[in-house]
Amino acid sequence: MLDKIISAAGMTKEDTVLEVGPGIGTMTQRLSQAAGQVIAVEIDTNLIPILKDTLQDCENVTVINEDILKIDIKKMAEEKGGGRPVKVVANLPYYITTPIIMGLFESGAPIDNITVMVQKEVADRMQVGPGSKDYGALCWRFSIMPSHTSWQMCRRTVSFRVRMWAQRSSV
């Protein structure tokens, strides 16, 4: 599954990746192998010692113990990414998906792409158009992207589906 996420993000050694919610660092380790630099933002203070232990050999990872919704994402991306657009990768819980993605859009940060793993229901809702009962904030935000913004950046694609047993075991 981690390889599929890295592939979906189109990651290279030249990329700076912003990982939202790295948890104990399992995906972060793989991201550090695929990307040039990884910025891992984790809100849970209790996970930081575990995360740092897991990532002790990953010299290209910076761990930040903050709430992604309260960080100046643009400033962080510009400082850590050297002015180049960053790629965002996250495994988002249902209840926080919309605020995080909206925050990324509204940050003005130089973002190359956003690759997130979300529940099927969220992915389905992200792909509906105007007039659907499920049309919501994320769909609306996609629809008002400036004309100079590449549709490629705004494309919503289901790259792969997670089997039910994997969803349960990852809880």
Regions found by a protein language model. Give the residues of each.
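Catalytic cores of RNA-modifying enzymes
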Residues: 1-171
